[in-house]
C-alpha cells in the first residue's frame, strides 16, 4: 500500500469503504456500480478522504449476502482496517469500460442543462441517486433557470427524451410545476 498522493488523475468514484468486516482486516464496501460487485473488477484502487490519498491493491473480494467484502493487500489488522472507513474508492476514468450507444455514466450527466419540452431551462443535473424503482436526478437551479427550485426527476425513458453531451444538455418530458 502506498500512502503517497497519486499523480493528478481523472478519477471516478465507484464506491466507499463503510466499515470493517471480521478480524483479518477485511472491509465492507458500499458500491455505486451496477451490479454492485463490478467494483471488484478493478485490482488497483485510489482511496480518497478529506484530501488524503492512498493507492491500494485489491487482494480479493466477494459478495456475502447483501454485503460486499474486500481484502486489501497488506491490510491484515482489524483496527488498522477500521481507519479506512469513509474513504471513497476511485479508479481512473480511462479504466471504465466503453458503454453501448445511448448508455451513460452518471458522471457524464452531472452538469448537463435540463430543458423541458417548452424549451424552459429547469436547472442542471447536480447528482443522481438510486431508488428501488429507478435512478433519480437532482436538478438544481442555475443562472437562467426558470426558478430557484430543486427538482427530483426520474432517470427513465419516459422522462429523459434526449441527451446531447456535446451541447451539454438533456431534454426532458417534465412539467415545470412539478
Swiss-Prot record:
All residue ranges annotated as the PRC barrel domain in the record: 101-178
Protein's GO biological process: ribosomal small subunit biogenesis; rRNA processing
Pfam families: PRC_RimM, RimM
Any one GO MF annotation of this record: ribosome binding
Record-linked Gene3D superfamilies: PRC-barrel domain (2.30.30.240), RimM (2.40.30.60)
GO cellular component: cytoplasm; ribosome
Subcellular location as annotated: Cytoplasm
Keyword set, alphabetical order: Chaperone, Cytoplasm, Ribosome biogenesis, rRNA processing
Its job: An accessory protein needed during the final step in the assembly of 30S ribosomal subunit, possibly for assembly of the head region. Essential for efficient processing of 16S rRNA. May be needed both before and after RbfA during the maturation of 16S rRNA. It has affinity for free ribosomal 30S subunits but not for 70S ribosomes.
Domain notes: The PRC barrel domain binds ribosomal protein uS19.
Oligomeric and partner information: Binds ribosomal protein uS19.
Record family assignment: Belongs to the RimM family.
Protein's recorded name: Ribosome maturation factor RimM
